[in-house]
């Protein structure tokens, strides 16, 4: 008679992200972002792109995996970030998810060493502080274009925050000796502390300031 699955396979008592950090005590304070931040216990944050063709499928992707996916970007190509065009920078990470995974893991280890806190909780706080609540859109009336303030959906707020955190890290290590993991850790810590040195946090403040003037 075959043994039950619980006896045939090893089952850890607690699944930790990357085998190191628990998500049981991680708290999302922003009620609008809470349904879209996936914190399911998972050792390897990798969904194999199953969400790609599903509407709002990325809301089911683990938040750490979403950061890894943003790290694989090549940087801004149509506008300057930190005074530079960063097209094709960090191209060694493009399409190489395992390498991006190791970069994010190293960044989280740096955050844990510096803050003495769970790096996933620090990362969540950075997202909450970097997600703009208001933005502007262009409307045409009588052949004239106007900027109008609009509310930002929770999923887009999350997208903007993750994008700017990754771009801020790219800007910090652009053409200098700072590693990408170290730059990513510094960006996340600064955003979590609402430090104006954070690209993501300062960008959020700029977006909301422009939206406020367009009311």
Swiss-Prot record:
Pfam families in the record, alphabetically?
A: Ribosomal_S7
Q: Which UniProt keywords apply?
A: Ribonucleoprotein, Ribosomal protein, RNA-binding, rRNA-binding
Mention any one GO cellular component term assigned to this protein in its UniProt record. small ribosomal subunit
Q: Does the keyword Cell wall biogenesis/degradation apply?
A: no
| SUPFAM superfamilies documented for this protein | Ribosomal protein S7
| InterPro entries documented for this protein | Ribosomal_uS7 (IPR000235), Ribosomal_uS7_arc (IPR026018), Ribosomal_uS7_dom (IPR023798), Ribosomal_uS7_dom_sf (IPR036823), Ribosomal_uS7_euk/arc (IPR005716)
Q: Which domain of life is it from?
A: Archaea
Does the keyword section mention Ligase?
Answer: no
Q: How does it assemble?
A: Part of the 30S ribosomal subunit.
Q: What does this protein do?
A: One of the primary rRNA binding proteins, it binds directly to 16S rRNA where it nucleates assembly of the head domain of the 30S subunit. Is located at the subunit interface close to the decoding center.
**Name of this protein:** Small ribosomal subunit protein uS7
Q: Which organism is it from?
A: Thermococcus onnurineus (strain NA1)
Q: What is the lineage of its organism?
A: Archaea, Methanobacteriati, Methanobacteriota, Thermococci, Thermococcales
